[in-house]
A protein has these predicted regions:
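Single conserved hydrophobic/aromatic residue that forms the stacking wall/gate
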Residues: 1-13
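N-terminal-proximal low-complexity accessory segments that begin disordered
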Residues: 43-104
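An active-site-proximal "capping" alpha-helix that borders the catalytic cofactor pocket
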Residues: 69, 284, 494-511
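Contiguous, non-catalytic segments that form substrate-binding/exosite surfaces or channel walls
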Residues: 126-247, 251-453, 459
Length: 696
């Protein structure tokens, strides 16, 4: 699972989002509305880059890379190549037309000979940047299709002016026929309007544009198909359907498995090649075994092999360099079964990891003292490791928008019997913080100077600690009752799981145990996170939503659920209030200890819902508290936010690694640079990591 950067809610504007019904919570860093331009930098590194649409591009510094050994640098180089080879997979998973649309746009952008300063061409450039960022034509966070601001006539004429050989034409297809096929997908707002639809009462597959199910497959058919394939009494159940597309063939359902000689095979073959190149540079035999098992999984597509790989990966803890590469998180599938492809390469920040190790070493204490029913607690917490890492490269569904924390694997039985790894991505958190300073957000939305001072004093540490608690302990806590289907919460699994991990972190942030462990400086520190969390959940995350829309994304639903539930349940005692000052709405917290008790009660209920597989309970919580938006408050928040000129979403440009080789082809050094522009990086990736055909 992952945690994400929430929004301009705290001093660092880092707000984390937990993930879906998978427990791999990547702290998804949807660094929401945090910064525009960093005002004062303590170093000369340029953290902020260009801004377009609702997105601010950032850069992250790979601190310590130059001090690594040549072996470690070379390992990172080849693992990074493997991390970039799967880019086309995500585009295709997000929509069956995405690769063709991207290639049409790129060809016009690079080869167009007309007026490149015209309104239409500039609009095409902006649209292409958004397609690159979202790995498709739907918003990376809100899931809605974004509309081109250039005309169909302009695009058709431009496509006729470039070489037809560079266009994604079907065999025998004309340029006009290509336009007739693709333009409705791009320009008609009523066709494929949502990438992942979660609206209650609708067929979530037929109304979603994602490419995890073939044309004509219904939600009822898919649910029955996978229900029949589950072994009800299997103590080690595989994650059914994780790595395949479900299609209809001659009226019957069948899976197209993502593997070397199956669907996406041409991309997977290149991933395997680079994993093989990395293998000799592994630091331990355990890490070599991880790569061997991952390659075996990529070749066979066998999900039992995937569990074996996950087990080996959890046990491989002695290496400085680590990585994730594969089909991981299920946010993009409305049924929460099928995983998008993602990758990250990283190395441990040894000094910062001392913080997370204090939590993992005390995991049993936190489990024993949580406010949930003892029936839902783990009697013995196993194999929880936690570390702070430095990201070296981001790929797939972790790029350009990424996570600030990751907790894997997502398999419930592996987490229970083997354990899990939790990471907080320190250099990404640092980049968000550096870019967010001085953007005016706090002054606009935080109720008073005393609260702002509280946030400035404790906020950054609170954010890091909440991420650690969320990933390391929250996702790793609790257990399913025997016989509970791990997929029983369906579309509500992700927001419920993210809420569970967030609540675990919120509850324990206020505990004296953290002061005892030296993780918080005093008993007042937790209040900064409580305030920013409630402000974000009740108000400021709404800047990411278009007027009239509901909350769709799992992390946003989770935050709204927690904040609105606590607000409503504490209303009689005025625990939290929404007050007016000068015509503006603010969050006011009157009783922080009572708010903690409310978080504990909701944690107990959400753990019960998950442990028992209570679909009706999950549906009630999410639909009642996590979906609807107050239109008047929304209008006010949008107007106030617009004046700040802050982009509500953030993403990263990757560094560039160059291998220096001798006459025999041996790597003698690996250089890192941070100068590549967003356009140049995306065009290079489309050229050098062009791994899939137009239609898959």
């Amino acid at each position: 699972s992952r945690s994400d950067w929430s929004s301009d809610v705290c001093s660092s504007d880092l707000i984390k989002f937990p993930h879906q019904n998978n427990n791999m919570k990547h702290l998804l860093i949807m660094f929401f509305a945090l910064s525009t331009v960093a005002s004062a930098q303590s170093d000369k590194f340029k953290y902020t880059d260009e801004k377009f649409a609702d997105i601010q591009m950032l850069r992250y510094k790979v601190e310590g890379f130059e001090q690594l050994t040549l072996r470690q640098k070379t390992l990172i180089y080849y693992l990074s190549e493997a991390a970039l080879q799967g880019r086309d997979i995500l585009f295709d998973q997000n929509g069956r037309y995405n690769l063709r649309i991207r290639r049409m746009l790129e060809t016009v952008f690079t080869d167009y000979k007309g007026n490149r300063k015209s309104k239409d061409f500039l609009a095409l450039h902006d649209y292409l940047k958004r397609v690159w960022f979202s790995s498709g034509i739907h918003h990376h966070y809100g899931n809605e299709k974004f509309q081109p601001a250039f005309s169909q006539d302009f695009f058709r004429k431009a496509l006729h002016e470039v070489a037809a050989s560079k266009l994604p034409l079907r065999q025998g297809q004309t340029v006009d026929a290509l336009c007739d096929e693709i333009f409705p997908i791009m320009f008609d707002p009523n066709i494929m309007k949502m990438r992942t639809n979660q609206a209650d009462g609708q067929d979530l597959i037929l109304t979603s544009a994602g490419n995890y199910y073939g044309e004509g497959v219904t939600q009822a058919e898919a649910e029955l198909f996978y229900e029949q394939r589950k072994a009800p009494n299997d103590p080690f159940p595989i994650m059914t359907g994780l790595n395949s597309r479900l299609v209809k063939k001659d009226g019957r359902l069948a899976e197209l498995v993502w593997r070397e000689h199956g669907l996406y095979g041409s991309a997977i073959t290149k991933i395997i090649y680079n994993l093989q190149q990395a293998r000799p540079y592994c630091e331990t035999p355990e890490q070599q075994a991880v790569i061997d098992k991952l390659i075996e999984f990529y070749r066979t597509g066998d999900l039992r092999t995937f569990d074996e790989y996950s087990t080996l990966w959890v046990h491989a803890t002695e290496d400085l360099v680590d990585f994730v590469n594969g089909f991981t998180e299920t946010y993009g599938d409305p049924l929460g079964l099928k995983a998008s492809w993602e990758a990250i390469v990283n190395f441990k920040n040894i000094a910062a990891t001392k913080r997370t190790e204090k939590l993992s070493k005390n995991a049993q204490w936190f489990e024993d003292h949580s406010p949930v029913d003892p029936r839902f607690k783990k009697e013995k917490v196993k194999g929880i490791t936690a570390k702070v890492i430095t990201a070296a490269i981001l790929g797939g569904d972790l790029y350009p928008s990424t996570a600030i924390g990751i907790n894997l694997p997502n398999s419930d039985w592996v987490r229970k019997e083997v354990g899990s790894k939790s990471v907080t991505i320190g250099n990404l958190t640092d980049a968000y913080n550096k870019a967010a300073h001085g953007n005016g957000f706090q002054e606009e939305f935080v109720i008073d100077k005393a609260t702002r001072d509280l946030i400035n004093k404790y906020g950054d540490n609170d954010e890091d600690l909440h991420t650690d608690l969320h990933e390391c302990l929250g996702h790793g806590s609790g257990k399913l009752l025997d016989g509970t289907n791990p997929d029983s919460l369906k579309v509500y699994a992700s927001p419920i799981e993210e809420a569970r991990a967030d609540l675990f972190g919120l509850y324990y942030l206020a505990d004296a145990k953290l002061v005892e462990l030296g993780l918080t400086p005093d008993a007042e520190a937790y209040k900064a996170q409580y305030y920013t969390y409630m402000m974000n959940g009740l108000m400021t995350q709404l800047v990411r939503i278009q007027p009239g829309n509901n909350l769709e994304e799992a992390h946003m639903r989770n935050r709204a659920l927690i904040a609105h539930w606590a607000y409503e349940k504490g209303k009689a005692n005025k625990v939290v209030e929404l007050v007016k000052k000068g015509g503006k709405t603010y969050v006011k917290i009157n009783d922080y200890p009572a708010l903690r008790e409310l978080f504990g009660k909701l944690l107990a209920e959400i753990q019960r819902v998950k442990s028992e597989g209570d679909f009706a309970g999950a549906r009630r919580l999410v639909e009642d508290y996590g979906v609807k938006v107050d239109p008047q408050l929304h209008k006010e928040i949008l107007a106030r936010y617009a004046k700040l000129n802050i982009a509500p979403y953030k993403g990263f440009i990757n560094p560039v690694y160059t291998a220096v080789k001798d006459a025999q082809g041996r790597v003698t050094d690996v250089k890192i640079s941070y100068t590549e522009s967003y356009d140049d990086q995306m065009l290079r990736y489309s050229r050098d990591y062009n791994t899939l055909p137009d239609i898959n």
